[in-house]
Amino acid sequence: MDASTLFTRLETATASFRNLERQLADPDVAADPKRLESIARERSRLEPLVLDFEELQRLESERDSARQLLKDSRGDAAMEELAQDELASLQEQHATLTERLTLALLPRDPRDERSVMLEIRAGAGGDEACLWAGDLARMYERYSQKVGWAVQSISCTEADLGGFRELILSVRGDSVYSQLKFEAGVHRVQRVPATESQGRVHTSTATVAVMPEADAVEVQLDPKDLDISTARSGGAGGQNVNKVETAVDLLHKPTGIRVFCTQERSQLQNRERALEILRAKLLEREQAAAAERESSDRRAQVGSGDRSEKIRTYNYKDNRTTDHRLGRNFTLEPVLEGQLEDLIGACIAEEQRQKLEALSDQAEA
């Protein structure tokens, strides 16, 4: 991105920021909580950009003064050296800030700010795959807790020997999708299962889908397309187990998508959860189809989000996690403990690099 384009975009962002501040002072906006929250969120997103732009302008002014001082210092060796040092420092600060602002202005995925439904399904490997799905769930729960996101299991099918055949987690917080979107795909594990008596390494898989939450306005459901039935929730015993039909089995007839919810205490709550999951699945399907139509774009991304894409291998013997999109290895144990910062940060950096490359290609075209 050349300096002129960068400056123009920063001026536009600053104008938007000032407009949002005026709107926040409007009594009509203050009386509408949903609109107020939306405007406040966008203002918070733009504020660091505006402050950095002001700092960039200050640096440019000081840099011009340093250049003039250097010009005026010809013949005075001591003053000339001071001016050169000052100019070098200002140029370094300017370059660093320019790079940061360029990255901040890269095209944003409008879904990045959203909370998500995280679906984990056991793949190849039988009982070991179910155990692996459970390990992945714990990994994401630990990471989410570390960064301050709220995690709740909203649908699960437990396996006989532990773990899950299928699990859906609701992960809510700031910019959840912007980080967890890189987790979509096939996660492969290579280890000796607890049930293996001869010490042989087995390979198992689990598939992760990351679905941004969708609201009722965004994905409208026709009641005629829904087949909703209830069932008795299973449990470990107790007075109410298998006596009250609180579980909800939801079928979306046009797509065949089925959602079964048992985690909430009441039938109404399970019904609402099932509808949330269905909306997220339908939105994911719609956006995946749109991305497929723009296949050249999709293939260039760090991860296409395709459920069938093998993104990572976890090798217990070598204590190594390999991210195949990055071609990089990470230490296994911290990753499984939810220390995903370096791994996700590397994915974000690669995505930014690819976006910068695409902008450069467009500029040259």
From Swiss-Prot:
Give the record's family classification. Answer: Belongs to the prokaryotic/mitochondrial release factor family.
User: Matching PROSITE patterns, A to Z?
Assistant: RF_PROK_I
Protein name per its UniProtKB record: Peptide chain release factor 1
| NCBIfam families tied to this protein | prfA, PRK00591.1
- From which domain of life does this come? Bacteria
- One Pfam annotation reads PCRF
The annotated region (Disordered) lies at 289-316
Q: What is the documented function of this protein?
A: Peptide chain release factor 1 directs the termination of translation in response to the peptide chain termination codons UAG and UAA.
GO terms for molecular function, please? Answer: translation release factor activity, codon specific
List UniProt keywords, sorted A-Z: Cytoplasm, Methylation, Protein biosynthesis
State the organism of origin.
Synechococcus sp. (strain CC9605)
Which ranges does the record mark as transmembrane?
A: none
Q: Where does it reside? A: Cytoplasm
Please give the GO cellular component terms listed in this UniProt entry: cytoplasm
Q: How would you describe the post-translational modification of this protein?
A: Methylated by PrmC. Methylation increases the termination efficiency of RF1.
On this chain, the residues bearing N5-methylglutamine are 239
